[in-house]
């Protein structure tokens, strides 16, 4: 998909675990897109795709999703509207993805998103920051603070997450990712922990890319 900051493969992300914004989707699109580069800095993309919930085979509903992206100097605004493949046909997704090199070694990435559907009477909104510092050619450390709000009717439920990640590159294709993550929600919407307000976990992963 053209939408969002993170991707499915862990080799393409700095953090090993994914954000709430990523889990909210869309994950992928099947269809047609047209890319146009107006200059070295400015680009546009137009798309007509199946609903992102339709991941294989034919599209039985003949409902579609329309996509648009504009990018300027590494900052991207994304829009998707239409059917989601889960029974709703008026879902609007808005997304900003970008980042800035604040110094030779420090990078700030930003992802902000909003989604809403009158059919579903719900949606979500959230923001995640990606603070990453390169200490050497082989080791980087990053912090991803995130806030996510899920809406349903007149009710909102909020969850925040803080992820500290270290990346150690052993070779050009193999890296070790060590991570500590803390999730907190007074509304108890942490996935897999429906009765808990707080959750913490640690992960060590070897990621090989080819």
Give each language-model segment a name.
Residues 1-71, 78-83:
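Surface-exposed coil loops of outer-membrane beta-barrel proteins
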Residues 43-46, 73-77, 108-110, 141-143, ...:
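Transmembrane beta-strands of outer-membrane beta-barrel proteins
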Residues 61-63, 68-153, 160:
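Detector for outer-membrane/organellar transmembrane beta-barrel domains
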Residues 138-186:
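C-terminal hydrophobic structural anchor segments
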């Amino acid at each position: 998909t053209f939408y969002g900051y993170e991707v499915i493969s862990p080799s393409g992300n700095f953090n090993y675990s994914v954000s709430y914004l990523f889990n909210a989707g869309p994950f992928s699109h099947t269809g047609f897109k047209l890319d146009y580069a107006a200059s070295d800095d400015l680009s546009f993309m137009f798309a007509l795709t199946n609903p992102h919930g339709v991941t294989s085979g034919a599209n039985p509903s003949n409902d579609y999703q329309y996509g648009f992206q504009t990018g300027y100097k590494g900052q991207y605004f994304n829009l998707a509207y239409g059917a989601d493949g889960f029974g709703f046909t008026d879902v609007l997704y808005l997304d900003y993805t970008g980042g800035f090199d604040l110094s030779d070694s420090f990078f700030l990435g930003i992802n902000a998103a909003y989604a809403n559907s009158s059919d579903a009477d719900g949606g979500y909104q959230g923001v995640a920051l990606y603070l990453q510092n390169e200490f050497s050619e082989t080791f980087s450390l990053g912090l991803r603070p995130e806030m996510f709000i899920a809406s349903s009717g007149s009710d909102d439920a909020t969850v925040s997450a803080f992820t500290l990640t270290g990346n150690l590159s052993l070779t050009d294709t193999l890296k070790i990712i060590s991570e500590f993550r803390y999730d907190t929600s007074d509304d108890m919407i942490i996935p897999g922990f429906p009765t808990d307000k707080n959750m913490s976990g640690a992960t060590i992963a070897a990621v090989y890319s080819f």
